[in-house]
Amino acid sequence: MNNNIINLIAAIILSLSIIFGWQYFVVKPEQKKQQQQIAVQKAENLKKQQLKALVEPATGIVVQEESQVQRIKIESESLTGSVSLKGLRFDDLILKKYKQDLSKNSPEVRLFSPANTENAYFAEVGLVSNLSSVKLPNNDTIWNSDSEILSPEKPVHLFWVNEDGVKFLVTITVDENYLFTIEQTIVNNSDKELPVQSYGLINRKYIAVEKAVNILHQGPIGCIDENLKEYSYDDIKDKKSEKFAASKVDWIGITDKYWLSSLIPDKSSNYSSNFNYALKQGTERYQVDFISPVQIIKPGENFSIKSRIFAGAKKVDLLDKYEKQYDIKLFDRAIDFGWFYIITKPVFYAMNFFYGYVGNFGVSILIVTVIIKLLMFTLANKSYRSMKKMKNLQPEIDRIKNLYSDDKARLNQEIMALYKKEKVNPVAGCLPILVQIPVFFSIYKVLYVTIEMRQAPFYGWIKDLSAPDPTTIFNLFGLLPFSPPSFLMIGAWPILMAITMFLQQKMSPEPADPMQAQVMKFMPLIFLFMFSSFPVGLLIYWSWNNILSIIQQYYINKFN
């Protein structure tokens, strides 16, 4: 193989080693340190008094603490919780289909919590006016309701009348998944014009999140003027506020790894929107909000506006459905598919398709890997032939190098003439490697960010494809009664990956350069330690890919 090609492959491997080495040796220890800091911070927060005020949105609305008031119970196939009738706030929401962990008695995932709790997180929509004389419902308003339960079969109708006789009506519906629709209607029975603006906000007490290097976005997010806007918590903290004036707002919200809360305003107008940070009495709070232009409601007229709140799991097919049904631009990008979006999402679709037949995402990964191998077989065959030719030409290349060692231009000219004469493409040998890089990262992304892979089992001891292999050779895979430190958690699947990688190397032509050949021999061992902390689903893919490559190499060797 030409030294330039060897150098290219070595550079690719070195780059991957640096990326994943940083993840393993730098990010992981930092995460452990952060987790300790989080534990200390939580202990301190328990001692703090209840908060008196939250972040103020650009509208001037002050989100205040809630007393014990009547609530409307939320009950659907996917959600349980309640809506506060004081201020009409969505602040109590549990995702019924998801557990916090794999333990037997694990509680369900809680998304929203009231403002006076440790993990405060809530959403609300409402009305404001630029005239203080206009009496509108506010955070202290107690709404009247025609029902105590909100379900997909039974919407809730709320009403409130101010001292001037103006009626405010709200209809709330929820579907079988995670979408609330809130329609606000104003019936102006007064003799005055009413200038009003509709707003929506999501407010969250800061919770330290797992930090990852260019792997996953968590924090404020939205689609504004058909462009995806993503800001980390640190970005907003530094800026204090990121404002967008008179923009087309498809949706704004706050995203976690698997969960999303977002506001979806009515498409009838543009909106001003903000991503905000505030420190109140030692507590950090983040808020996203929007506000509409002023709407003048004349005496005797009615005015209605509709908003939606999504609060739940970021299921790919569900976000796709809402995006199409309600024309919500880039809603699926709430899932951080990464740089290789155009590859990652089709890879997920393929895995999900086969999952529908086999009922196991691990098996689905195996099937998709076989399909990818078949699609790349012709390319791999041509690559192998080119590598063999390069290997056979190496003595002649060495002779040319010795002959023209003092004339670099003539040296390159003679080598290129040799390639042309023998019909050899010096780049062909590395094409399969280059093609596999985006596929590898796409599968990694699918395993890391999609809710469908969360707590998805394989067979045997693998209960979660998105988590590392829980076994380790250093306690004989659980036979010895102790738990090694995290950097020694080298399980059965990482070992299988390293073994198959070693066998694959044995069947491939060795680099002509002895030093490079020696480096390549150590790569399985290096990757063994680097990838032991990666999602086991990725190791299953890589091990199976290596096995298929060995079979493919055997076939090519036999028939070529």
Curated annotation (Swiss-Prot):
Pfam families: 60KD_IMP, YidC_periplas. Keywords: Cell inner membrane, Cell membrane, Chaperone, Membrane, Protein transport, Transmembrane, Transmembrane helix, Transport. Required for the insertion and/or proper folding and/or complex formation of integral membrane proteins into the membrane. Involved in integration of membrane proteins that insert both dependently and independently of the Sec translocase complex, as well as at least some lipoproteins. Aids folding of multispanning membrane proteins. Its main location: membrane. GO terms for molecular function: membrane insertase activity. GO terms for biological process: protein insertion into membrane; protein transport. This is Membrane protein insertase YidC. It comes from the Bacteria. Interacts with the Sec translocase complex via SecD. Specifically interacts with transmembrane segments of nascent integral membrane proteins during membrane integration. One of its GO terms (cellular component) is plasma membrane. The gene is yidC. It is a multi-pass membrane protein. PANTHER family: CYTOCHROME C OXIDASE ASSEMBLY PROTEIN COX18, MITOCHONDRIAL, OXA1. The chain crosses the membrane at residues 5-25, 334-354, 357-377, 431-451, 476-496, 522-542. NCBIfam families: PRK01318.1-4, yidC_nterm, yidC_oxa1_cterm. It is found in: Cell inner membrane. Belongs to the OXA1/ALB3/YidC family. Type 1 subfamily.
